[in-house]
Amino acid sequence: MYNETPIKRRPSTRIYVGNVPIGDGAPIAVQSMTNTKTTDVEATVAQIRALEKVGADIVRVSVPTMDAAEAFKLIKQSVSVPLVADIHFDYRIALKVAEYGVDCLRINPGNIGNEERIRSVVECARDKNIPIRIGVNGGSLEKDLMDKYKEPTPEALLESAMRHVDILDRLNFDQFKVSVKASDVFLAVESYRLLAKQIRQPLHLGITEAGGARAGAVKSAVGLGMLLAEGIGDTLRISLAADPVEEIKVGFDILKSLRIRSRGINFIACPSCSRQEFDVISTVNELERRLEDVTTAMDVSIIGCVVNGPGEALVSHIGLTGGHRKSGYYDEGERQKERFDNDNLVDSLEAKIRAKASQMANRIQVKDTTE
């Protein structure tokens, strides 16, 4: 498949969230956030494990109270994925979760308090080698900035971010990343563009409060796609009013679409029409469901007829082209003698895809050990 990419990543410094490298050319990390009550340790741990299962690199957990901080201690002991503590209003909560091994602290400049409080958080983070995310949000800008700009603007978000970047600079603390999120695509995109020109720290991308599963995914894909295509962004979170697991899936789909980072199967499927020789939609849906556990990056084309089928199969790892009663099967662009019965496509394709994924994974492993 044609995969030449003109995308040149923005140069940035390197930090680590747990064992996950961020910035300086590291793979763009995909993260989500739990939506359980943090004090419900069992439910929160279960959700974090579900996120880890679908590929989450980092998980953020809201810690609104000291009781939640105590719960965070137990949660941290129960999972292996790096955790970010989301802190608002009370800086003392940040100090407490730092004692419990948090991997990153997210603080909101709009409500964390004065510079002295920030200094306390920074000194604690420095002592324990914990990075910080300065998380600016268009919905919670500082009052003086709202008075100055009257509404959230790219300049307002930038000023909020930079005043806190300056504080960290004065404190000689450089282990941080920054985000300037907004629910409006154009506001967020322009804010990130301005910020990218001002600093070299890693940038965490997101369209905040993007909406439900469908609309939020589209809005995030448009906004983040614009930034990623310009080389901006080192981590991302898709904010959906939906199961957090969907955020991880959409995040990887966006990166996969831009050929930035691939995980799992990239299904190339026609929308179907009266020429289809089998039910394309149900076939693809069932294969997606069955093959969610496959992490090997591969392209699979499933086309219902011979108009575009052979051409798509030519540039896929595995291809299927609809035919009368039996459909043609391709491996690495080569037409195979084997044909699949249209009434048993899903089982046949699942077996072939799993075998191919295993073969490709072994090939990568051998290559890595010989280099």
Swiss-Prot record:
Converts 2C-methyl-D-erythritol 2,4-cyclodiphosphate (ME-2,4cPP) into 1-hydroxy-2-methyl-2-(E)-butenyl 4-diphosphate. Its cofactor is [4Fe-4S] cluster. Pathway: Isoprenoid biosynthesis; isopentenyl diphosphate biosynthesis via DXP pathway; isopentenyl diphosphate from 1-deoxy-D-xylulose 5-phosphate: step 5/6. It comes from the Bacteria. This is 4-hydroxy-3-methylbut-2-en-1-yl diphosphate synthase (flavodoxin). PANTHER family: 4-HYDROXY-3-METHYLBUT-2-EN-1-YL DIPHOSPHATE SYNTHASE, 4-HYDROXY-3-METHYLBUT-2-EN-1-YL DIPHOSPHATE SYNTHASE (FERREDOXIN), CHLOROPLASTIC. It is an enzyme of class 1 (oxidoreductase). HAMAP family: IspG. NCBIfam families: ispG_gcpE, PRK00366.1. The gene is ispG. GO terms for molecular function: 4 iron, 4 sulfur cluster binding; 4-hydroxy-3-methylbut-2-en-1-yl diphosphate synthase activity (ferredoxin); 4-hydroxy-3-methylbut-2-enyl-diphosphate synthase activity (flavodoxin); iron ion binding. Belongs to the IspG family. [4Fe-4S] cluster binds at C270, C273, C305, E312. GO terms for biological process: isopentenyl diphosphate biosynthetic process, methylerythritol 4-phosphate pathway; terpenoid biosynthetic process. The keyword Metal-binding applies. The keyword Iron-sulfur applies. Keywords: 4Fe-4S, Iron, Iron-sulfur, Isoprene biosynthesis, Metal-binding, Oxidoreductase. Binds 1 [4Fe-4S] cluster. Its EC number is 1.17.7.3. It catalyses: (2E)-4-hydroxy-3-methylbut-2-enyl diphosphate + oxidized [flavodoxin] + H2O + 2 H(+) = 2-C-methyl-D-erythritol 2,4-cyclic diphosphate + reduced [flavodoxin]. Pfam families: GcpE. InterPro entries: Dihydropteroate_synth-like_sf, IspG_bac, IspG_bac-typ, NO2/SO3_Rdtase_4Fe4S_sf.
